[in-house]
Amino acid sequence: MFLLPPGFKIAPVLTDPLIQDPVGVTFDGNGRMYVLEMRSYMQDADGSTSRQPISRISRHEDTDGDGVYDKHTVFADNLVMPRIAYPLQDGVLLVLETDNRDMYKYTDTDGDGVADKKELFYAGAGRVTNMEWQPGGLTWALDNWLYMTYNPYRLRIAPDGKVLREETEPNGGQWWSAQDDYGKTWWVDGGGEIGPVNIQAPIAYGAFNVADNFEPDFQVPYPVPGGIADMQGGMNRVRLPDGTLNHFTAASGVEIYRGDRLPKDMLGDLFFNEPVARIVRRAKIVVTDGLTQLRNAYPKSEFVRSTDPLFRPVCIVNAPDGTLYLMDMYTGIIQDAQFVGAGSYLRRKVEQYELDKQHNWGRIWRITYEGMEPDRRQPKMYSETAAQLVEHFNHPNGWWRDTAQKLLVLKQDKSVVPALKTMARTSANPLARIHALWTLEGLGSLDAALAREMMKNADPKLRIQGIRASETLYKARDTSLAADYKALVKDPDPNVVIQAMLTLNLQKVPGAAALIEQTASASSVRGIKEIGTQIIKGGNSLGQRPSLADTGAGGVNLTVEQRRALQRGESTYKELCFSCHGADGQGAPMQGAPAGTTLAPPLAGSARVNGHRDYVIKVLLNGLTGDLEGKTYGTAVMVPMGSNTDEWIADVASYVRNSFGNGATFITPAQVAAVRKETKRPQPWTLAELLPTIPTALTNSAEWKLTASHNPAAAANVTSGTPGARWDPGAPQAPGQWFQIELPEPARVSEVVIESALPFNFGGGGRGGRGTGPGAAGRGAPPVPAPASPGATAAPQTGAPAPAAGAAAPGAPPAAGAPAGPPAGRGGGRGGPPASGPIGYSVQVSTDGTTWGAPVAQGAGQTPTTTIAFTPVMAKFIRITQTGTASGSEVWGVARVSVLQVAK
């Protein structure tokens, strides 16, 4: 069943029926094991019961020290696929369920092993989306911050019990997280086929990677030949002729071995699982000139391989007994239902091998080595004094050290501060010194003198810890530490120099950018040059990120809310989308497939992405499957994201439409809500189904007949093509002013776009820029006005640029010195006063020009562009009536107009 390197053994710790579908394990301070059981996961190919509250967190205890768990309780039952079960104090767990936005604290108050109290711990830790893309696997790191996958922030429990939050870059992790002896957090990406991600620095400092993160072919797995080829990526992911996986597709469950009951050459090695390949990978971490590279410890082989098609390793953890515990869901289907759609390659494989009938099992395995027995000592940390906990910092097993530090920080017992300071200064064990240092930091008892001593230590690893720990003091306004950081960019060890640069950047120390650039330029060490250059270039760390008040790329002025929307959208893109669409929006290459094959379609320069907003909205809400114009992609399906909020959809859509060289209008939550309301669809679109529902601009404007209630002779200016020409009523805005379009033949219209201010073309481009080419506002729609010059009024939230300096904002009188407007009966040609959108509008349609129904749309206009969308309706005549009253001499103008239709 299993193939392991010589000397290694694997044996069950727990199996079904005591547990089912185990996906993760944690241990509390007394060594009791908590198992996350996703008992509802993929009970059939459609995942029809996945969200039923039948999952649990079970607790298991070895009461006599023989290595066998003999006491079992259900700590928390009736859960929806739990993702986090993290122990704090005795009987206290942090719990996060699937599709729950909030993390809770569960407490067993009477000691029976069953939680009987539930309290909110942190609101907003979770999300509602595809279950594979939700946070999980919490780590209390060396720095006393809590990290979990996906979320672009870290949490901390303050001494008063409050939960603090600090932003980080998105970590890229999918399932579980880990840390090494020096507090570097580790993550693995699954769906993006990457494996370990962001490996060059702790994620708190940024998402740093280099081209050679991995040795050649590191992402190629080596399963036992004779697989059943059940890969979501189809034949592109099948190694022929043996039917096994040819590239990572589902890496998960990361761990750094830090125990003491396996061979010493394993210490510090990285372990993660590939459940589609049925393997566990062991990787050597090699640091050269400050840069990390991962290498397969068993070239063209693996640490654990299995011949059993139901072997599904998803998580691996250090255990209190010094060994590694391996979680095996032991199930048929490992992908979520959205990737096993009817008619898909994977669905056919599931049906062929009846994988949908293989579930409700599970195993937890212990990996040992010949001649090295597991440590049978049972932890009893909950009953130990603070002084006894400090002694565990000398333990050779990292689990004991981490747990003791966590409990000391939670206790906030400062009676051990003198002992900790002595240990930090004098212990012969460097790891004990590091834990003592960080425990002092967690107790609020670290002082600058000790931090500086560490920064001057002969051991570069201790110098790095001194820098990192001192950041708490710098943030507390001890800015004298800036001089220490700056001095350390000249350290002889490149790893120390890199840490100094990271700290200077993250803490935004004055003069940091120039010093980092100078250091990177002057150094011949590759790591210093690479990381320093990435810091200065920006985009992968928070330190150099512009503030919301800064002017955007391309000279475009955005509102604060638009800039926030871009930042939220960027964060989500880096969390979820990049792994398939690529960090540059060009589509992530599908390794091993024919040249040019990507996991998902390119977003950069896409006419559909830059086209009408409904395309992006509908794809995000409902998903997209099948080929796109004859081209297939590795993921085969864009899963629906409609479980997210309207704001979430709008943020992501606005980001991709204004990044990677794209330039299109912003999308608002209201626009998403309107599409959501009209689109009731349970399955993803195909392109053939979707395109007929996307509005396209009528191209026969030369045949339109235009008229108006006031100044009708000028109405024809709108389609004349004469630069600067427009229609306006020749008087301030007042109810009853209307502008009418007669089409040459009836059309199924759904939208009217009115541009009131003439476009100003000052160039632009880049992220955040507004395109001026066809399709910027919608497929075939007229161009969106180019960016206003610096100093122009802030743009309205529709995403349209602001009017030029001196133009009136909507609903406001003209700027001082501006013309008051033309005399009644005049105007409408070139050179008139600045015009704005309608204060209010009402749209009616008719098929004969005589019979007019109730308004199909009503609302408030915007300047310079008013977009009016409504339920598709057959119309030959379209009348837009102005309904508001100007407070001054504000004139309604129409410079250009477009009418959009849908096929169905």
Describe each model-derived feature in a short phrase.
Residues 387, 546-574, 586-592:
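Electrostatic cytochrome c docking/interface patches
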Residues 396-397, 428-429, 458-459, 492-493, ...:
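Short inter-helical turns and helix N-cap capping residues of alpha-solenoid HEAT/ARM repeat scaffolds
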Residues 544-564, 633-703, 765-782, 787-791, ...:
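Flexible coil segments in periplasmic/lumen-exposed cytochrome c-class electron-transfer proteins
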